[in-house]
Amino acid sequence: DSKVIYREYIQNACDQIDLAIKLGILSSDEGYVDIYIDSKKRYISVKDNATGVRAADFIEDVGDIANSNKEIGKNKGFRGIGRLCGLAYCKTLKFTTSYLGECIKSIMTCNAEKMRAMLVENKKYTLDEIWDAIVTYSTESEEKNEHYFEVEMFGINKENTDLLNDKKVRDYLSFVVPVPYKNTFVLRNQVYSYAKSIDYSIDEYCVRVNGSQIFKEYTTKLKEQSGASL
């Protein structure tokens, strides 16, 4: 399912939101992940307001595909090369980030279309040769108080049009990412109370698709195996 790229990028963002709260950059309820989908332009953006990446660390942290500071069992997102999963679904993959207090934003642009062309050529390329051929780095000025990380995918492949289906993406995310329960879910308070009684923290984040927040779509309707309501 190509929609797994949304889960990957959201989980990475949630890890950084946790860190931003720990560092005092965000309060516990300020973090968010905004997804913007433009089906006509075949464009997707996933942006958070977490820590961002320092300019001095950008190439090592984002550009080194073998490098990762993820901790197994602690962090939600995949490690290392996982951030590049979008390469399979678009013509261009772009990362833009800025760290609080720095007047600069760092940009890494990956030519996914060129990568695929090189992979089908008769000539055999090393990973480093392909990487050097498809990646460019640049910087631009930014407001000092800005802090974010944004993933952009330009030219979504025709085979992956489901990534541009707003409703399908919302439905998928409501079941696979750590978002709050709907207020209409009558067992909501019971779930929170029980979690509190066993000292268990339920991770919940504000995730929005085209401005509309995503919630868990749980209901209290019980059905038999036949499908009949109880």
Task: Report each predicted region and the residues it spans.
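Interdomain "switch/hinge" adjacent to the Bergerat
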Residues: I21-G77, G101-L230
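Short glycine/proline-enriched coil/turn segments at helix->beta-strand junctions
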Residues: K40, C90-K91
